[in-house]
Regions:
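Alpha-helical segment proximal to the catalytic Tyr-Lys
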Residues: 2, 36, 179, 223-224
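Conserved glycine-rich Rossmann-like NAD(P)H-binding loop of the short-chain dehydrogenase/reductase
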Residues: 90-104
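Substrate-binding pocket helix/loop in short-chain dehydrogenase/reductase
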Residues: 150-151, 158-159, 256
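Active-site helix of classical SDR
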Residues: 174, 210-213, 218
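Residue(s) in the substrate-gating loop at a strand-loop-helix junction
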Residues: 194
Length: 281
């Protein structure tokens, strides 16, 4: 993938014997402009016995009738995810911290969704989500923070803050929703990881650990969902042009842009398009 010119992508689909009828969904995504920033990826397609019906499927509104929660939805990637999911027909519940309520209400209001101000690190966050949203068809765990320092200069507070928001909250909320009938039988969960969780990054030990943990959590949870129609996946974006990454020193930003397969930074909508595909039926 790294040998191609800009604008050319290469991915591979591993398909389990007997799962060929599930290929259409993936091929439509990878052959469309929606996958423009997805390259060098391996996707595994399995048949878990769930039935496929395209009779009433509307490709222009693939998420019509689906109730989906997006965390960290007041800005950046979360806001873009909310916009794309709304475009694709989803009923949205937009969640962010109470301090971002004004921005959150603006995003949710513009999309005809619901604003849910909530600190996801609260021990009863899962309970509050279920009470506010009811049974969900999808959850996008996008909320996350950085508190960058080299390991030698990392305070316990910054370490714990990043791990609690980026990883522990996801695990706690998923566990509550899965054990308290908070997810529909064919629900989709998508967790936002990062390339830092795969390759690490200088001065981001806490962030890299949290995002690596997200990948491990998804892989472990996927095994527990085996045999059901529920799905869980993670996306690990490379360098994405957001306000958060805009605060990174220029040299590091430029290195981040050049390290990915596309040799350029992505936009939040690129991540959003991939997430919309993963939460679609």
């Amino acid at each position: 993938a790294k040998e191609f010119k800009k604008g050319i992508t290469a991915n591979v689909l591993y398909t389990q014997i007997g799962a060929e009828e599930h290929l259409d969904h993936a091929l439509r995504f990878f052959m469309s402009a929606k996958s423009a920033y997805v390259s060098g990826q391996a996707v595994y397609i399995k048949d878990n016995g769930d039935e496929i019906s395209l009779v009433d499927f509307d490709e222009t509104k693939p998420l019509k009738g689906k109730k989906i929660l997006v965390t960290g939805a007041s800005r950046g990637i979360g806001e873009s995810v909310a916009k794309v999911l709304a475009r694709d027909g989803a009923e949205l519940y937009c969640l962010d911290v109470p301090a971002s309520l004004a921005d959150l209400q603006k995003v949710a209001g513009n999309l005809g969704g619901h604003a849910l101000p909530l600190d996801i690190t609260q021990t009863d966050a899962g309970e509050q989500i279920l009470k506010a949203c009811g049974v969900l068809d999808g959850v996008v765990h996008n909320a996350g923070v950085t508190r960058d320092k080299t390991l030698a200069n990392m305070s316990a507070y910054k370490w714990d803050l990043v791990l609690n928001i980026n990883l522990k909250a996801i695990s706690t909320i998923n566990n509550y929703l899965l054990t308290n009938n908070g997810l529909s039988e064919s629900a989709r969960i998508v967790c936002v990881s990062s390339i830092s969780g795969i390759a690490g990054n200088l001065g981001q030990t806490n962030y890299a650990m949290s995002k690596a943990g997200v990948i491990g959590l998804v892989e472990a949870t996927a095994k527990s969902l085996d045999g059901s129609a529920r799905r869980i996946n993670a996306v690990a974006p490379g360098f994405i042009e957001t306000k958060m990454t805009g605060a990174i020193p220029f040299a590091i930003r430029e290195a981040g842009r050049r390290m990915n397969a596309m040799s350029q930074g992505g936009e939040p909508v690129d991540v959003a398009a991939t997430i919309s595909w993963l939460v679609s039926p």
